[in-house]
A protein has these predicted regions:
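A broad "ordered helical/assembly scaffold" signature
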Residues: 110-124, 132-133, 138, 158
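Alpha-helical membrane-embedded segments
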Residues: 98-104, 124-144
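A sequence-composition feature that detects small, non-aromatic residues
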Residues: 11, 57, 75, 92, ...
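Charge-rich cytosolic interhelical loops and cytosolic tails of multi-pass membrane proteins
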Residues: 1-75
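Cytosolic/matrix-facing juxtamembrane and C-terminal tails of multi-pass cellular membrane proteins
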Residues: 121, 136-168
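Generic structural signal for hydrophobic core residues of well-folded globular domains
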Residues: 38, 103, 162-165
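Membrane-proximal, non-transmembrane alpha-helical segments
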Residues: 41-122
Length: 168
């Protein structure tokens, strides 16, 4: 997580006073909710003093929203977040496997054109295109920004549970 979120997770960061990811009215409503449900939760004047409180609040909220039947959107966004994070962790392997596939396809094409093997050229071209597309996907789509975006969506879904009747 430190690779994409070096300081705080998106839900924690969203609750800081300096953050503009959530409008101030909604943030005040969340603060009120946490004050009513978590003993010792308080709002501090600066972000550094607020960090332990928002971290505790998010941890508490995660533990209260684990039921997938009551909170399906949170479960879905958490799954998406975890999936994108795992993809980023596998990026080097994905690029390596795609490059090996491209090299293998080019070698087969070389052998085909020099009549060492008899293979349908359409299949070779199709598999080369597929490997190239996967290589492009690994390079340009699976990025830190994809994980950060998924993390922010999860944070939004998680914090919106404060407005749910299921927690009151």
């Amino acid at each position: 997580m430190k690779k994409c979120f070096p300081k705080l997770l998106p839900a924690q960061e969203s609750l800081l006073l300096s953050s503009h990811q959530i409008d101030s009215i909604t943030k005040q409503r969340y603060y009120k909710f946490f004050s009513e449900h978590i003993d010792g939760f308080k709002i501090c004047e600066n972000d550094s003093d607020m960090i332990p409180y928002v971290s505790s609040a998010v941890t508490w909220l995660i533990s209260k929203t684990r039921d997938c039947t009551k909170f399906p959107l949170i479960a879905e966004e958490n799954t998406n977040f975890g999936f994108t994070y795992n993809l980023l962790g596998l990026k080097a392997y994905g690029i390596t496997v795609s490059c090996i596939g491209i090299f293998f396809n080019l070698a087969l094409m070389f052998l085909f054109f020099y009549n060492f093997i008899c293979v349908d050229l359409k299949i070779l071209i199709a598999s080369l295109v597929i490997n190239l597309l996967f290589l492009l996907l690994w390079i340009f789509i699976v990025t830190k920004s994809l994980v950060i975006s998924a993390g922010k969506k999860y944070a939004r879904a998680l914090l919106s549970a404060c407005d749910s009747n299921s927690l009151n």
